C-alpha cells in the first residue's frame, strides 16, 4: 500500500514512478480527487460530531434544570441522521481509494534500473565455472525418465499437466536439499525455522500484495481459504497487526513448504520438465527490519541464497531487476540465475526482494523507536527463495550428469543421502 501523504506532496513524481513499473495509463489525478472528497467529508463529520456533542451537553443541562429540551432533542436526531448519511459517503470514497491503491505496485528504489522487461536487467556478478562436457548433455527430464525416477506421464493421469512424481533417489535428493538448505540458513545465517499452514485467509494474501491483483493465479477452496503460492505469505504475516520493539529487529524466519500456483500467464512456456509447476517445494527466507537495516539485509539475504549454490558448486549469476520486471510488492530485487548446460543459459532459481514499507502498511506492522517510544514507524519486509527445490534438482541433474545417464551427487549432499555418491538406474 502507498502513503497517501507522499502522493499529495509529489503527485507527478508518484505518477512517473508507477508508470515505470508498467502501469502505463496511470494518472494521479483520480487518486487526488477521491482523496479530496474523502477529506472534505471527514471534515464535515468532525464538525457534525462536535455539534452533536454540544447539543447533547445542552440537553443534559436543560434536563438537570427541568427545562424544556424538545427542540434540542429534535436537532440531535437530525444531526445523527446527517452523520449516518455522510459516514456512508465517506466510507464509499475510502473504499474507492483503497481499491485503486491496492492495485498499484510498489515504487522502485532509487538505484533500480528503469526498463520494461528482462532485457533491461543488470548483471551484478557471476560465480563458478561452467562445466565442459565431452558428450552431449541431456535435459533433466530425459535423464529422470531414463533413470526411471521421474514420472510425468503418471502425474498427468493423476493430476493433470505441470505436475511431477519423483521416486527413489530423486525423491531422496529433494528431501536432502530441504534439510541441507534449512540447516544452512538456521546455523549459518541465524534464521528461525517455522512450520506453518498451507492454507490462508484472503486477508493474509492481501497483506503481502498477492490480492487483489493476482487473485486468478491462486487456488481458492470452497470455504474461501487459499493455497499459498509461497511461504512468504505466512512468514510475513507472523508479525501482522503488531508493534515491535526496535531492539528485537531484525527478525528472520525460514520455512520449507509446498507452493501452489495456477501459472495462468505461462501458457506454452516450459511445458516439459520441472521448471514451471502448479505445485513445487521451496525454502523461503523472510526478514522484518527497521528502515535503516533493510538495505544491508537484502544483501545478507541474497548471500544466504548464494551460499547454497556455492556449497553445491553450481555456476550462477546475480541480476538486478529493472523496474518493469520486479514483482508487485518489491522495491528492489536480485534474481539468482543458475546455469543450465542443455539450455545453454542461466535460469532463475531464487528471487530476493526488499519491499520497504509496502507490505507493512497493508498489514499495519510498526516498531517503537528506542530513542523515542512515542514515535512509531512501519517496519520494512524482505523475502527470498533460498532455494526452489525442483529447480535445484534440475540444476544438479543437468550440471552433474554423466555420459552413462547417471548423476553424481554433490559432495555437500552425500551425508544427507546415506553417503551415496551417484544417482543411477536401479
UniProtKB/Swiss-Prot annotation:
InterPro entries: aa-tRNA-synt_IIb, aa-tRNA-synth_II, aa-tRNA-synth_II/BPL/LPL, Ser-tRNA-ligase_type_1, Ser-tRNA-synth_1_N, SerRS_1_N_sf, SerRS_core, tRNA-bd_arm. The keyword Nucleotide-binding applies. Pathway: Aminoacyl-tRNA biosynthesis; selenocysteinyl-tRNA(Sec) biosynthesis; L-seryl-tRNA(Sec) from L-serine and tRNA(Sec): step 1/1. Pfam families: Seryl_tRNA_N, tRNA-synt_2b. It is found in: Cytoplasm. The keyword Ligase applies. It catalyses: tRNA(Ser) + L-serine + ATP = L-seryl-tRNA(Ser) + AMP + diphosphate + H(+); tRNA(Sec) + L-serine + ATP = L-seryl-tRNA(Sec) + AMP + diphosphate + H(+). GO terms for biological process: selenocysteine biosynthetic process; seryl-tRNA aminoacylation. ATP binds at residues 261-263, 348-351. Its main location: cytoplasm. GO terms for cellular component: cytoplasm. Transmembrane segments: none annotated. Its EC number is 6.1.1.11. Keywords: Aminoacyl-tRNA synthetase, ATP-binding, Cytoplasm, Ligase, Nucleotide-binding, Protein biosynthesis. SUPFAM superfamilies: Class II aaRS and biotin synthetases, tRNA-binding arm. NCBIfam families: serS (TIGR00414). PANTHER family: SERINE--TRNA LIGASE, SERYL-TRNA SYNTHETASE. Homodimer. The tRNA molecule binds across the dimer. Catalyzes the attachment of serine to tRNA(Ser). Is also able to aminoacylate tRNA(Sec) with serine, to form the misacylated tRNA L-seryl-tRNA(Sec), which will be further converted into selenocysteinyl-tRNA(Sec). Belongs to the class-II aminoacyl-tRNA synthetase family. Type-1 seryl-tRNA synthetase subfamily. Consists of two distinct domains, a catalytic core and a N-terminal extension that is involved in tRNA binding. This is Serine--tRNA ligase. It comes from Wolbachia pipientis subsp. Culex pipiens (strain wPip). The gene is serS.
Amino acid at each position: 500500500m502507498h502513503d497517501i501523504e507522499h502522493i499529495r506532496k509529489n503527485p507527478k513524481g508518484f505518477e512517473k514512478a508507477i508508470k515505470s513499473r508498467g502501469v502505463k495509463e496511470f494518472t494521479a489525478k483520480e487518486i487526488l480527487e477521491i482523496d479530496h472528497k474523502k477529506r472534505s467529508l471527514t471534515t464535515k463529520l468532525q464538525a457534525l460530531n462536535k455539534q452533536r456533542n454540544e447539543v447533547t451537553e445542552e440537553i443534559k443541562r436543560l434536563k438537570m434544570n427541568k427545562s424544556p429540551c424538545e427542540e434540542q432533542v429534535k436537532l440531535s436526531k437530525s444531526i445523527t441522521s446527517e452523520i449516518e448519511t455522510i459516514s456512508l459517503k465517506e466510507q464509499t470514497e475510502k473504499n474507492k481509494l483503497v481499491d485503486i491503491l491496492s492495485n498499484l505496485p510498489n515504487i522502485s528504489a532509487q538505484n533500480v534500473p528503469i526498463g520494461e522487461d528482462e532485457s533491461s536487467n543488470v548483471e551484478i556478478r557471476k560465480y563458478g565455472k561452467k562445466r565442459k562436457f565431452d558428450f552431449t548433455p541431456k535435459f533433466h527430464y530425459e535423464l529422470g525418465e531414463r533413470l526411471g525416477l521421474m514420472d510425468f506421464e503418471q502425474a498427468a493421469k493423476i493430476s493433470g499437466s505441470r505436475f511431477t512424481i519423483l521416486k527413489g533417489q530423486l525423491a531422496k535428493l529433494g528431501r536432502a536439499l530441504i534439510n541441507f538448505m534449512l540447516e544452512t540458513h538456521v546455523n549459518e545465517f541465524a534464521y528461525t525455522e517455522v512450520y506453518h499452514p498451507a492454507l490462508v485467509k484472503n486477508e493474509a494474501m492481501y497483506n503481502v500484495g498477492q490480492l487483489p491483483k493476482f487473485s486468478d493465479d491462486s487456488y481458492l477452496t470452497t470455504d474461501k481459504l487459499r493455497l499459498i503460492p509461497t511461504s512468504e505469505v505466512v512468514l510475513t504475516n507472523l508479525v501482522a497487526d503488531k508493534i515491535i520493539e526496535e531492539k528485537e529487529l531484525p527478525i528472520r524466519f525460514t520455512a520449507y513448504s509446498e507452493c501452489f500456483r495456477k501459472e495462468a500467464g505461462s501458457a506454452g512456456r516450459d511445458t516439459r520438465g520441472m521448471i514451471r509447476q502448479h505445485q513445487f517445494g521451496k525454502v523461503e527466507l523472510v526478514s522484518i527490519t527497521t528502515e535503516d537495516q533493510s538495505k544491508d539485509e537484502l544483501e545478507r539475504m541474497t548471500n544466504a541464497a548464494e551460499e547454497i549454490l556455492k556449497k553445491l558448486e553450481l555456476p550462477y549469476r546475480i541480476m538486478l531487476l529493472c523496474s518493469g520486471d520486479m514483482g508487485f510488492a518489491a522495491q528492489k530485487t536480485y534474481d539468482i540465475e543458475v546455469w543450465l548446460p542443455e539450455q545453454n543459459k542461466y535460469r532463475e532459481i531464487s528471487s530476493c526482494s526488499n519491499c520497504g514499507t509496502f507490505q507493512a502498511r497493508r498489514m499495519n506492522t510498526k516498531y517503537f523507536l528506542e530513542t523515542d517510544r512515542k514515535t512509531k514507524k512501519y517496519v520494512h519486509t524482505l523475502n527470498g527463495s533460498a532455494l526452489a527445490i525442483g529447480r535445484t534438482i534440475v540444476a544438479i541433474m543437468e550440471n552433474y550428469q554423466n555420459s552413462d545417464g547417471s548423476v553424481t551427487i554433490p559432495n555437500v549432499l552425500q551425508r544427507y543421502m546415506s553417503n551415496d555418491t551417484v544417482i543411477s538406474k536401479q
